[in-house]
Amino acid sequence: QLGRQALVYDDERILGGLDWNVAGRYHDALKLGYANKNNEVHLILAFNQNDEKKIGGTYYASGAQPYKNMQTVWYHYKADAIPFGASLLFMNLGLETGDAATQDSHTRYLQTMGTYLTYKPGSWNLDGAFYYQTGKNKDAEKVSALMGSVQAAYAFDKTWGVVASFDYLSGDKGNGDKFKAFDPLYGTHHK
């Protein structure tokens, strides 16, 4: 696929649709994919350029595109014999900042990588995710952040069920030389 599209993967913690507001969340990207019975892989490439700076620079003012460039690989495995699935995600984001007066721009690269696991035996639905971020944020701070989640759901019937879940996102405690606040990027923050 080539063009404006929603990128929705796994539990939507990193890439989600978020289509409840007028703008929605769409990416101008090239998405290449391959799938067979048990495996699926996507390669996503995106590049953003402001109209007013097509020639002579690419400074991004606040409120512009959320990233300069993005490269993402997503892989999903679905088992035959048991109700198990596993996904791996790697995303490299080029975040651009600069000075409008000097037209000096800098691109910082932030990497997010992780896994999402599901197991659905009978009336149970168990899933978990873990993601790690490294690289640099827009402010050129070194990043070392993580997010983890687990969820267990049981369906009594088609109408009633119970869910227990736990989420953890690291925060910036101000200690050390690394920025520790995890950025959920383009995920759906509520459903």
Each predicted region: which residue ranges?
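Flexible glycine-rich, low-complexity coil/linker segments exposed to the extracellular/periplasmic environment
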Residues: 175-191
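Signature for the C-terminal beta-barrel architecture of outer-membrane proteins
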Residues: 17-175
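Well-ordered mid-protein domain cores that form the structural environment of catalytic cofactors
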Residues: 1-26
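Short glycine-rich loop/turn motifs that provide flexible caps or phosphate-binding loops at active sites
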Residues: 2, 170, 186
